């Protein structure tokens, strides 16, 4: 997995954005440009104006939720292939299914560890590499 990438972390809680950022650095994403947005609307504006390699988003946010952000990403031709990892306190089966149906690449329930984050990211990028090799 390439650890030199541009990641957008989306969460309305600044402490959670900082936790995700610190865990990414702990996992070796030291040459990575990590940017932050506090809701889905701001994230979508950023995604439309500059390229990113990964979005890590919360579900529950004001203005535009993470699931609505995911749906907007999948609806835009220029963004639809962007990997999205949902990091949320939502452990409801229906919401996990809704995220899968909307095209999420991975789902992590808070609280989580660096090991869990690494495993999810590894799986996401392994699947992307495998689908690219077969395309």
Q: Where does each model-flagged region fall?
A:
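Two-component/phosphorelay signaling modules centered on CheY-like receiver
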Residues: 14-35
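Helix N-cap/capping motif at the beta->alpha junctions
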Residues: 36-45, 66
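Short amphipathic alpha-helix used as the core "switch/output" element in two-component signaling
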Residues: 45, 67-80
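Active-site beta3 strand of CheY-like receiver
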Residues: 50-56
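Receiver (REC) domain active-site loop signature in two-component systems and cognate sites
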Residues: 61
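Alpha4 helix (beta4-alpha4-beta5 surface) of REC/receiver domains from two-component response regulators
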Residues: 68, 91-106
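C-terminal output helix
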Residues: 112-121
